[in-house]
């Protein structure tokens, strides 16, 4: 898989295919920075495909805590950019975090497009955090079922 976004020619193909399948169009009312609401209709079929593909690879390469921290940081990151704070110290700090996390995210994704839906067909990566062998309870030698009670008791304390 390429280490950079696809070429312009490939991007045009993605945009056309996504557009034919009604992907990437959003109609929304936004809360503007200056305190008013405005309606916008945006069409980004190629960008929507790239976002779904990137998230599909993130889901198998990033661990739980990293994913959680990323999901918490991204709304703030987007808000800073939307409000014109591209050169702010806060945006630079968030960018450093994003860049560190992104080093683990690599691979390729096959997507199927059908009537407005993006279906993940396959994901391949050289640095998976996910392993089918580790999550199989039937044949898993690393998962000891007798530890379940201790695990539950430990986490139950958080509820008291």
Question: What is the role of each PLM region?
Answer:
Residues 13:
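Active-site loops and adjacent core secondary-structure elements that bind or stabilize anionic groups
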Residues 1-10:
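Single conserved hydrophobic/aromatic residue that forms the stacking wall/gate
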Residues 18-160:
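Peripheral terminal appendages
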């Amino acid at each position: 898989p390429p280490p950079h976004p696809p070429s312009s020619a490939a991007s045009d193909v993605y945009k056309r295919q996504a557009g034919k399948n009604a992907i990437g169009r959003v109609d929304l009312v936004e809360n503007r920075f200056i305190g008013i609401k405005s309606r916008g209709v945006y069409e980004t079929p190629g960008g929507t495909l790239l976002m779904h593909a990137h998230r599909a690879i993130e889901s198998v390469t990033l661990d739980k805590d990293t994913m959680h921290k990323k999901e918490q940081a991204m709304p703030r990151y987007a808000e800073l950019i939307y409000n014109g704070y591209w050169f702010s110290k806060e945006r630079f700090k968030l960018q450093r975090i994003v860049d560190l996390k992104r080093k683990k995210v690599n691979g390729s994704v096959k997507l199927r497009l059908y009537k407005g839906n993006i279906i993940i067909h396959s994901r391949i990566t050289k640095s998976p955090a996910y392993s089918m062998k580790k999550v199989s309870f039937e044949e898993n030698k690393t998962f000891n079922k007798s530890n379940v009670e201790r695990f539950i008791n430990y986490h139950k304390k958080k509820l008291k």
